Amino acid sequence: MNRPVRWVTYASLGLAGLVAALGLVVVAYGAYLATFLALPKSDEHPPLHLYSGPFLLQPDLLLVHSHLLERLQRLGYRRVTLPVQAPGDYQLTDEALTVYLHPQPEGHVGATMVTLRLNQGRVTDVLSPLDGTPLFHIFLEPELLSGVRGESRQMREWIPLAQIPPQIVETVLTIEDRRFYSHFGIDPVAVGRALWINFTKGGVVQGGSTITQQLAKNLFYSPRRTMGRKFKEALAALVLEVKYTKQDILESYLNEIYLGQAGFVSIFGVGEAAHRYFGKTLQELTVEEVAMIAGLIKGPNSYAPTKHPEPAKQRRDVVLRRLRETGLLTEEAWKRAKDEPVRVTPSEDVLTDAPYFVDAVLHQVEEAGVVPLPEGLRIDSTLDPMIQQAATESLEKGLAKLEALHPHLTSALESVQGAVVVLDPQSGSVLALVGGRDYRRSQFNRAVQARRQPGSLFKPFVYLAALEAAREGQAGQLTAASLLVDEPVTFESETGTWSPQNYDKQFHGPVTMRNALEQSFNVPAVRAAKTLGTKPIVQLLHRLGVTSAIGDDLSSVALGSSSVSLMEITAAYGAVANGGVAVKPAAVRSTRDRRGDIIWNAVPDRQQAVSPQGAYVLTSLLEGVIQRGTASKARAIGLQGSVAGKTGTTDGYRDAWFVGYTSDVVIGVWVGFDDERALRLTGSQAALPIWMDLAGRIIPPTVPAFVMPPGIVARTIDPKTGQLATSQCPEQVSEVFIEGTEPSVYCEVHGGGIWERLKHTFGFP
């Protein structure tokens, strides 16, 4: 009898000791957690700040086209009638604009006064108003574009609990933790209820976590579902309940809860959600909008109203029904709220002015190795806010006009899309980037992520490769005056025979390279690529900055049936505009930590991809495209001077392109459908009008000529023969050549020209 009693006693003592030991471990671990677990404060998470590029104040600026006065207003400058006296003042007269510039601590520049002398709206001199001496390298300070938060690329507006409307607090507590004020961090009733429901439903359909547990998980632990993590989460909740008041915990929860995405940036907190989804403050939200935000907590991405409006409405209605059941909503208010459709009207703030650009910047910073993004990081970008605004407006207006003119574009399930890229060809700076029609509907960046066939945009590079071959004396060489045969031809390919056709279904006989490119004839381009070989053309494209894979068949190379991004092809044309120097596009200039110390400085990645002479001749050919060719209507916007460009239309009319440039700026435009259905429009019809509208806004009316490099000669030729013209030739044109490749034979068709031949033979001028 004593042995069993003794055994039970020992077992009980052992179990009690084990429980006590486990209790001590738990207490010790809890004490350990208490030393470092802390709720965030509103000032503990300084945002990441993204700034535009600086704006150089220099002679020849036009007040209208540079939008200088608008820039001053956006930066908070005040126009005064008296002489400027304080930083932020500016005075404008017919003769001068005097600005008292704000200090720029990041550039170690103090407040500075500067006078821009004017002549009919054009800046003639940049001077010091104190002594009249010329000033150089004077910049307007960068504009703050966006404030996001570091490591998770978060947007969060911290709002004290006292400023959060009771309706929001009550709604969140009703749907997430009805017993918040009565439990101690863990709610046994909720856990038991969840276990029973999950058991009866045969799966996990409901959780039992309290708001305190959710906060602990979000702040301190990974989202992995393991027993160990659940134990730590529960213990952390207990510690938080001991260390902080219920009000502290609730305030942190409402400001830290994850509520969805705005592109690559995470939305945290009810205040930011109200701002991003509805463009409102918390005080302005309706009951159904409050229910929508509260419903997001369960599945921010599954119930996002911007992407999944129907599931979002269903979840919202669940919340509304719960509010009615608990008496927080009357029957009448519930019926009115549930009948409201889902309306999402995000704020039109600086982030939505350039959202695709912001995404591209964050991606480039992370590619540079600044990972994770530190809190308080400052990113100095290359964006020009006024050009960005113009690009956005031109794309929106242009696509709307296309739909009005061509009703078949509106019959599709998806809207026609477009993208715009604006680069500085000399520095590679991305001045503007619009990746789609509506960022709120689709965050897919068509300017950098989409790969589409460029069509005729590849033709200039076929001819550029041939010009370079001529310069180097290699096989396949051609000049701008070379005759190319535009007649029916059949080629053998891996898939059988192939006979290229021109857009107009006609053949035009022998044509010069210039005429073939101006009119975008297909057959001459294919013949030139066949003669030269595709390998040099592919290599040239890669040197110019095209990183996408390019097929080595004739169709891929000559007619652009390989896929590239708008950014790549725009950069390739930028290299031509820059005298053959390819500069990798960059959206970021530098990054600094919260102390102002530089973390990373962008170093331009540049190389001489082609000769300055080859680039100049090709630019001359592309000027002809705008003067006489497929883009001749571009002159309607009144541009005078040197502008070059090329239209692009893909097989089946799925994509429409135009890339045009001056020596200072290159603009690329793409129009098409995301699902690659036929657009049934050419580049001249769909993309060129958008380019024209944007160019008319940002390019001055008078454009300086492209600088002719040494090694270029001009000759008068007969375009019918491509030979030197004689006095008997009925048509004579001036053509440019790389020195050493110019024709030496006089026209053999029209005769005459004895005097010209004698001068050429004996070297007379």
Protein language model annotation of sequence segments:
Residues 77-78, 164-167, 176-187, 200-205, ...:
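Bacterial peptidoglycan biogenesis and beta-lactam-recognition machinery
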Residues 754-764:
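Short, low-complexity, Pro/Ser/Thr/Gly-rich segments in the mature regions of secreted, periplasmic
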Residues 72, 172, 215, 249, ...:
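Conserved structural-core and active-site-/substrate-pathway-adjacent residues in large, well-folded domains
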Residues 197-225, 280-283, 347-353, 357, ...:
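Conserved catalytic neighborhood of penicillin-recognizing serine enzymes
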Residues 381-411, 417-424, 433-434, 438-444, ...:
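A penicillin-recognizing enzyme superfamily signal
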Residues 124-157, 268-273, 301-305, 334-335, ...:
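Short pre-catalytic segments that frame enzyme active sites
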Residues 309-313, 448-456, 507, 612, ...:
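Short, conserved loop/turn and helix-capping segments at secondary-structure boundaries
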Residues 1-404, 429-431, 487, 527, ...:
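Juxtamembrane regions of bacterial inner-membrane/periplasmic proteins
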